[in-house]
C-alpha cells in the first residue's frame, strides 16, 4: 500500500508463458505418441528444407524433405499431401501442417514395420513371398485344419499379379484392408 503522496509500485507483468517471437518451443507441439525430441527432429528437417526461409515448404521442398526422411515421394503424392494439408490455400505447408503430415507418416512407417515382422513369420524360406507351402506350414503350427483348396483361396485373394505367391505389398494391402474384397 502506498503512503500519502507516494505512487504505488508499478505492477510487474507476469512472465511470458508463450514462445518468444523467433524462438521455437517444441513443447508447444508435443502430443501423445510424439516426444519433444521427435518434434525437434521434424523441425530440424522442416528448417533444412525451408530453403527460402519463408516458414513454409513448397512442393519441391516437401519432396526433398520426405526423401531425406526415408519416405517415397512421388510428385503426385507430394501435390496430394499439400492439397490435403494446405488449410489456407497457399500451395505450401507451414510447420504445424508439416508436423501433422510427418506424425502420420511415422505412425504408418511403424505400422508397416510391424506388418513386415508378421509377414516374415509366414515367409519361412525368406524368399520375399508367401507360398501355399508357407501357408500350409503356418496353419499346421497354429493347429488349423485347412485343406489346400482353402489355403489356395487365401493366397488367391491376396495375390495381386496371379503368380500364386503373396508379396509383402500384397500382404500389407490385405492387412491394412486396402484391397481386401
Curated annotation (Swiss-Prot):
List of residues binding Ca(2+) 1: 50, 52, 54, 56, 61
Any Pfam family the entry gives: EF-hand_7
Keywords for this protein: Calcium, Cytoplasm, Cytoskeleton, Metal-binding, Repeat
Quaternary organization: Monomer.
SMART domains: EFh (SM00054)
Source organism per UniProt: Paramecium tetraurelia
Binding site for Ca(2+) 2: 86, 88, 90, 92, 97
Domain (EF-hand): residue spans on this chain: 37-72, 73-108, 110-145, 146-181
Ranges of biased composition (kind: Low complexity): 14-23
Repeat among keywords: yes
Molecular function (Gene Ontology), one example: calcium ion binding
Entry protein name: Caltractin ICL1a
One term under GO cellular component: cytoplasm
Gene behind the chain: Icl1a
Location(s) in or outside the cell: Cytoplasm, Cytoskeleton
Coarse class of the protein's main subcellular location: cytoplasm
Amino acid at each position: 500500500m502506498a503512503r500519502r503522496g507516494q505512487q504505488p509500485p508499478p505492477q510487474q507483468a507476469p512472465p511470458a508463458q508463450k514462445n518468444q517471437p523467433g524462438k521455437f518451443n517444441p513443447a508447444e507441439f508435443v502430443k501423445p505418441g510424439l516426444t519433444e525430441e521427435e518434434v525437434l527432429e521434424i523441425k530440424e528437417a522442416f528448417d533444412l528444407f525451408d530453403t527460402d526461409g519463408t516458414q513454409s515448404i513448397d512442393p519441391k521442398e516437401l519432396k526433398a524433405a520426405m526423401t531425406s526422411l526415408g519416405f517415397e515421394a512421388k510428385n503426385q503424392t507430394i501435390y496430394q499431401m499439400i492439397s490435403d494439408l494446405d488449410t489456407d490455400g497457399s500451395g505450401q505447408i507451414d510447420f504445424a501442417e508439416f508436423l501433422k503430415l510427418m506424425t502420420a507418416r511415422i505412425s504408418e512407417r511403424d505400422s508397416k514395420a510391424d506388418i513386415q515382422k508378421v509377414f516374415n513369420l509366414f515367409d519361412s524360406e525368406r524368399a520375399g513371398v508367401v507360398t501355399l507351402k508357407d501357408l500350409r506350414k503356418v496353419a499346421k503350427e497354429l493347429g488349423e485344419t485347412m485343406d489346400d483348396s482353402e489355403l489356395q483361396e487365401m493366397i488367391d485373394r491376396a495375390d495381386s499379379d496371379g503368380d500364386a505367391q503373396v508379396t509383402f505389398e500384397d500382404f500389407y494391402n490385405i492387412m491394412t484392408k486396402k484391397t481386401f474384397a
